[in-house]
Amino acid sequence: MSEEIKEQNVQDAQNENLAPDSVNFDGLSDAAKVAELENKLNELTDKYYRANAEFENIKKRFEKEKTDIASYANEKFARDLLPVIDALEIAANFDPDDDEFAKNVKEGVLITINQFKKCFEKHGMSEIDTSGEFDPNVHNAVLRVDSEDHTSGQIVQVMQKGYIINGRVLRPAMVSVAN
């Protein structure tokens, strides 16, 4: 019952919008009638162009929102993978000495890391550059240290790698900075 009422209201509203506005021609000359009709035509043409422009703007906004939603989903997924890549990189730093099995495991871990990095690049994700000067937009200084080898403000050591996805910081790089 409620559905029928809603549908009838929608149809009534549509019919009102489609009903032509009546133009009163009583007592008007032919030239005045033509002028009145031209005014009405111009008014309706303007309404049409405005409605069409609004529709195009809505389409563009919808497409942008759709890509933003997909990008946000990718960011969340990528953020969840960061601890995995961190753990693999810690495992890759293990020194196997002369143990052949450990060397093979390390080689497998390095291959896995490279596959992760290729996948990250494919989806617009990359490591934050940590060579050179400290940049508060992409680096997080967790330590200030004295260093003879580095000038003040230069990155001395990377504690944790940072990542950017599609131009946005996913996780800042945690670094130590020279005094």
From Swiss-Prot:
Matches recorded under Gene3D superfamilies: 3.90.20.20, Head domain of nucleotide exchange factor GrpE (2.30.22.10)
GO biological process, one term: protein folding
SUPFAM superfamilies listed in its UniProt record: Coiled-coil domain of nucleotide exchange factor GrpE, Head domain of nucleotide exchange factor GrpE
N-terminal signal peptide: none
GO MF annotations in UniProt: adenyl-nucleotide exchange factor activity; protein homodimerization activity; protein-folding chaperone binding; unfolded protein binding
InterPro entries hit by this protein: GrpE (IPR000740), GrpE_coiled_coil (IPR013805), GrpE_head (IPR009012)
Keyword entries, A-Z: Chaperone, Cytoplasm, Stress response
Keyword Transferase annotated: no
Compartment list: Cytoplasm
PROSITE patterns: GRPE
Keyword flag Chaperone: yes
GO cellular component terms, semicolon-separated: cytosol
Region annotation Disordered: where it falls in the sequence: 1-23
NCBIfam families from the UniProt entry: PRK14140.1, PRK14149.1, PRK14159.1
Record note on quaternary structure: Homodimer.
Cross-referenced HAMAP family: GrpE
Family designation: Belongs to the GrpE family.
Stated role: Participates actively in the response to hyperosmotic and heat shock by preventing the aggregation of stress-denatured proteins, in association with DnaK and GrpE. It is the nucleotide exchange factor for DnaK and may function as a thermosensor. Unfolded proteins bind initially to DnaJ; upon interaction with the DnaJ-bound protein, DnaK hydrolyzes its bound ATP, resulting in the formation of a stable complex. GrpE releases ADP from DnaK; ATP binding to DnaK triggers the release of the substrate protein, thus completing the reaction cycle.
Protein name: Protein GrpE
Organism: Campylobacter curvus (strain 525.92)
